[in-house]
Amino acid sequence: MHIPDNYLSPQTDAVMAVAMVPVWVHCIKKVRATLDREHMAFLGICAAFSFLLMMFNVPLPGGTTGHAVGGALIALLLGPEAAAIAVSVALALQALLFGDGGVLSFGANCFNMAFVLPFAAAIVFRALNSRLHDKSWGTPVSAIVSGWVGLCLAALCAAIEFGIQPMLFTNASGAPLYCPFPLSVAIPAMLIPHMLVAGVVEGVATAAIYGFIKKTAPSVIVGPEAVDGQLAAEGAAAKKTSLVPTLILVAVLVVATPLGLLATGDAWGEWDAEGAATAVQEAGDDSLQASVGLDTPTFADALPTGDYLQAYSEEQGLGFAGQAAMYILSGVIGVAVLTIAFRLISLTVKENGAHGDGRAA
C-alpha cells in the first residue's frame, strides 16, 4: 500500500499533501494537549510497532503481497490523533531512509494509512465495544473488526487514487502518463486481497498486541476504552505496570522481521518499471500495453527500481541469510530512530498531561 513516486500525478500528490496539512495540525495540537511525557515517549514505541508490522509482508491472492500497518493498534492504545502522528513519522522514515514509498506521494500514503485507517478503526471500535465490552470476547472481536475495516478502507482509498490517474492524465496519444489501471481494475485488485488476507492480519495483530499491552501495561492506554470509562476498573486494579514486556515484544518482532522475506512477489501498485510492464501485459489489454511503449515518456519509464534494501541485496547477490541480516538491521535502525526521536520530543512535554475529558477521541 506504499504508493511509489510516479504512480500518481504531481497534481494528485499535491492535493493529497495539502489535504493532510489540517489533519497533521489538528493531531499535533491534540496530542500535545492530551499526552503527558510518559505517553509521548510510549508513542515512539507505538511508531516502532507500526514500522515493524509493515515489514511483515504476507502473500495475497493473485500473487501479490501486503502487510499490516498498525494504525488501528495505535488508535486503540493512544487515540487516532496519536496514531496519525506515529504512522506518519514511520512512513517518513521508510520513504527517506529505506525507499519504501515515494517522497512525492508521502501525503497520499499518509492520507490512506495514517488518517483513514486509524480514524475509521477508532470509530468502528467504539461503536462495537460500547455494546460488547461486558463480554469476555467483546473487546478482541471489536479490535479485529476495527483493524479489518480500517485497513480495507485505506486500501480502497489507494485504489481510487490509482484508478483516477488514467481518467485524468494522458499523453497526446491518449496513453496514461501515470498508473494505467482504471478504477474497474484497481479497486478489485487492491480491495479483494486486502479484505481476504491483509485486513485480517491487521485485525488479528491489533487484537493480539492490544490485549497483551492491556494485561501488562494498562496504564499506558488512553484510547477509546479509557475515554469511555471501560478501563477504569482494570487500571485501578493494576498497582504495578511495566513496559518491559512490551519492549521484549518489540525486540522479538525485530528478530522475526525476516519472515517478511518469505512472501514473494511485489505488492500491487508497487512495481518497478519491469514489474509494471509485466503487470500491464498480463492484464491483456492493448490500450494498457500502449502505456509502456519505449517511444513515449510513459509512467513506467520513470519508475524507481525498488526499495534500497532490495536493490542493495540484488546488487551484492546476497542469499537469504544476508537479506535476513539486512532486514534485522533495518528494523533495529527504524526502532532506534523512532524511539529516540519521540523520547526527545517527550522532553518538551509537561510531566503531567491532561488526561481528563480531553483525552483521545
What annotation goes with each model-predicted range?
Residues M54-A121:
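Alpha-helical membrane segments and adjacent membrane-interface helices in multi-pass membrane proteins
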Residues A114-A158:
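Short helix-perturbing small/polar motifs within transmembrane alpha-helices
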Residues M16-K29, F49-M54, F119-A122, G147-F162, ...:
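Hydrophobic core segments of alpha-helical transmembrane domains in multi-pass membrane transport
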Residues H2-I74:
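Hydrophobic transmembrane alpha-helices
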Residues M1, P297-R343:
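Individual transmembrane alpha-helix segments
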Residues V141, V145, A189-P193, V227-V250:
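Membrane-water interface at loop-to-transmembrane-helix junctions
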Residues E225, L338-A361:
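Juxtamembrane interface at the cytosolic side of transmembrane helices
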Residues V252-D307:
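Aromatic-rich transmembrane-lumenal/periplasmic boundary elements in polytopic membrane proteins
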